[in-house]
Amino acid sequence: MTRVRDLSEEQILERIVPLLPRGSATLLGPGDDAAVLAAPDGRFVVSTDVLVEDRHFRTRWSTGYDVGRRAAAQNLADIAAMGARPTGLVTSLVVPGDTELDWVTGFARGLADGCASTGAGAVGGDLSGGPCLVVSITVHGDLEGRSPVLRSGARPGDVVAHAGVRGWSAAGLALLETGLVRVPLSAAPLEVTDGVLLEDEWERLVAAYLRPDPPLAAGVLAGQAGATAMLDMSDGLLRDAGRIARASGVLIDLDAGAFAKDREALRSAARAVAAATGLGDPGWGPGNADIDGLVDRWIWAGGEDHGLLATFPAGTGLPEGWTAVGQVHAVEEAQDGGEAAPAVTIGGEALDVGPGWDHFRS
């Protein structure tokens, strides 16, 4: 069994660089002091994100392949949320010396598979030793002549729409924490057809947590269709919708009946998790309220699905992959005569299902 400490940095790079995608916009890839990417638009969209062992992933659940897929997903989704097309990533990887080389090569394969649908290249980065696994990625994107879609553009009358799955990652995490699903999974990609789970439904939820599969093409389609605001939902629907509401100075009201297909996909897992954790009777009777509440929490507050939330002008035909889930309203005066704060409601009512993910409180 070969470990990282058994090889030099150059020998490790010789194993992983050939596994990485070059990318259609790459003019100069790994091997020099810096990479060179084409920028036909004249502008770069740039974002960065970090994953830390035992904070964002756990090696008892996640293989190197899983972490590579997750790292690609959460970075590429940020570019898609601006209405841009991802073009290239630079990756910094910190690995303890006793890490198996197979973990590192698996990471490279996962990163490559995560980029495959976008044409983005893994064009360089850095490799270092350290006390725990850390991944930091900076990703670039191309607007292709369009304006970036900001969080601050939502206007009263706009339609709120969603692309991707809701609550699956949170349910997958719960299944792992309760021991109801064993890992590791195979390296097969997550397959989703019209919101319906394929193969083993619990395993698909766990795969959504370990290897998020964001609707990257939907971001470009939204930008082309004239979306007024958009973001990547990594921290929970209510928390992230609130970011659009505050940036735009509006009220967002979400449809209480939205995400029916996701609810159906989650209910079996919720019943099992409720039984395993003592939330309530998993059969008929009062326990069903606990199950519904758990599904609500996953839908409204569950993070790391990396779906997209956007607003579109009323009357706009929603692009492929998008579903209407709410409405944008003007912020009305508060009862005391002052100005009410931008907010998010569900069916016109405030709902407390937890705060969503916060890096310093969760």
Question: PLM features: what roles do these ranges have?
Answer:
Residues V36, N75, G83, A122, ...:
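Residue-level signal for inorganic ion chemistry
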Residues G64-L89, R109-S117, A217-V220, G236-I244:
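Small-aliphatic-rich amphipathic alpha-helix that forms the alpha element of a beta-alpha
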Residues M1-T63, M82, T91, A112:
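Extreme N-terminal cap/leader segments of soluble proteins
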Residues M1-P21, S62, P96-G121, S128-V135, ...:
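Glycine-/charge-enriched secondary-structure boundary and capping motifs
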Residues V192-G242, D292, A301-G307:
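Polyanion-binding loop/helix "lid" in catalytic or ligand-binding cores
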Residues A39, T87-G179:
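Glycine-rich anion-binding loops of enzyme active sites
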Residues S24-T26, A34-A35, A112, V123-S128, ...:
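A generic local secondary-structure boundary/capping motif
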